[in-house]
Amino acid sequence: MFGLLVNFYRFCRKKTERKITIALLGLDNAGKTTLLNSIQGEVDRDTTPTFGFNSTTLNEGKYKIEVFDLGGGKNIRGVWKKYLAEVHAIVYVVDAADPGRFEESKMTMAEVLENQFMRDKPICIFANKQDLPTAAPAAEVVKGLGLATCRNSHNVFPCTAKMPAGQDVDHRLRDGLKWLVGTVDREFGRLDPRVQTEAEEVRQEEARKKKEREERLRKQREERLRQQKEEEERAREVEKENELHDGKAPSLLAAGGGVVGAAAAGVNGVMVDEQQELRPPGQHQEAPEALGLHNGLALGLPHTIESPGKFPPPPRRPLEAHPASDLRLVAPDQGVSSASGGPGLGAMPSGSHGGGGVPPQPASLPHVRAALPPLPPSAPQPSDAGVGSSGSASRHPGAHSSSAAAPPNVASGAAAEDGPEPDAAGTAAGEAGSGSVFAPRPASAGGGGPGSRGSGSGMTPDARELGSGGVESGEGTPARLRAGAQQASDGGHGNSKGSFSLVHTSNKVVPVAPDLRAGIPGAPNDA
């Protein structure tokens, strides 16, 4: 029977017991944790500043009170709003001995009351540290915090959280707690469902944000892993490429076809193998092979190759010839000594123009004439026949206007420089018949056999070198020509631009002005 009564009492007490949640707020150094310890009866317990959140459970009558002790620092006040949806009431602690912070405390409490979850919830205000001489009374605290305009149920209780040693806990602490619990009890039927609903909404919102945050972190982690994998694959490809091509011939040479395949053979006939190493000379490869590969690659690549010159190259100087110029200035007339100091050449017989006469060979350079190859015949041009005869003008005494009577050492259509100036008729005729000295002209345009001299036209460098006939057959003049030619600048119409001499030096035919002939080795001076 006694056991049944005990169980019935416990059942009734459990049914009437209610749970409420209270948030303990206030600025830093206001005494929040000390006040909570005093309510619990732990007066002598040392406290430290609260950084974050502490939870404590109290029993008051039929209520089980859960207290959230939140830190009051500036960096911690931002987290207060996360707990306001779960509380039924608030305990706000003010340092009454520090009136200078009333304004800061007022702004902080106003931000809390403006939160949507604090609507119509009671507030218990403790004006702490009343034992200090600078402590403000409750009326000044109400004025300093601006509680006159507060719409929430509120009440101010001056108190001293930390009593001197040997004294009991300040009863005003218990009075303020009883007032708050009684106010919540009167509104419990309205507050509790609202607190449960708002707390659930906040938990769901927090869960949703947490899930989004985790999803965002997961995507970022996957993106980092993907980028890391791509970088590793790219690094492996580069490493593989380096292993395949580092020190090896390029893959384009392995094809072996087209221009590149043909050019890969090299210049000296050295074939480049596909696996042949390309290294500088002295490092596992000889210099000629590397040079051949370089030239082969250069030929295989697209290049713009200029077309060769239109004029045939000048004859190469024979090895046994004199190292000076092959074209030397000589006296063009009879009885005049040659440039080398030998006897005079004399006049060319008239029969030589017809191909039957053999001119006398000079005794100065017989080995040069014997070493030169015969001049190949060239095709005649229509503009050469019978034109240069009337245009030839000689400055030598006794010179004729006909090309057949011209000195053998002077090309037709050119004026020699040793005689007087030609007259107007000779100059006009020369302008009509003279051509470019570099244009190829036939040697037989004036008629005659292989040894005849062409008239009225310029001559190729080979013709000026060899004279008018073949050397081996003994035909033509053996004299070295003194080409005092007038170069045509308008397509061969004979506009005189000045005199120059053709000097063959270092395998090249170079036009030299008369005043510069003294500086050329082997070229005599007119003076």
Curated annotation (Swiss-Prot):
The protein's role, per its UniProt record: Cilium-specific protein required to control the microtubule-based, ciliary axoneme structure. May act by maintaining the association between IFT subcomplexes A and B.
Alphabetized PANTHER family for the sequence: ADP-RIBOSYLATION FACTOR-LIKE PROTEIN 13B
Assembly: Monomer.
Sites where the protein binds GTP: 26-33, 69-73, 128-131
Keyword Lyase applies: no
Similarity comment: Belongs to the small GTPase superfamily. Arf family.
One Pfam family matching this protein: Arf
Keywords: Cell membrane, Cell projection, Cilium, GTP-binding, Membrane, Nucleotide-binding
Positions with biased composition (Gly residues): 445-457
Keyword Zinc-finger applies: no
Compositionally biased spans, kind Basic and acidic residues: 200-248
Record-given protein name: ADP-ribosylation factor-like protein 13B
Gene Ontology CC annotations of this record: ciliary membrane
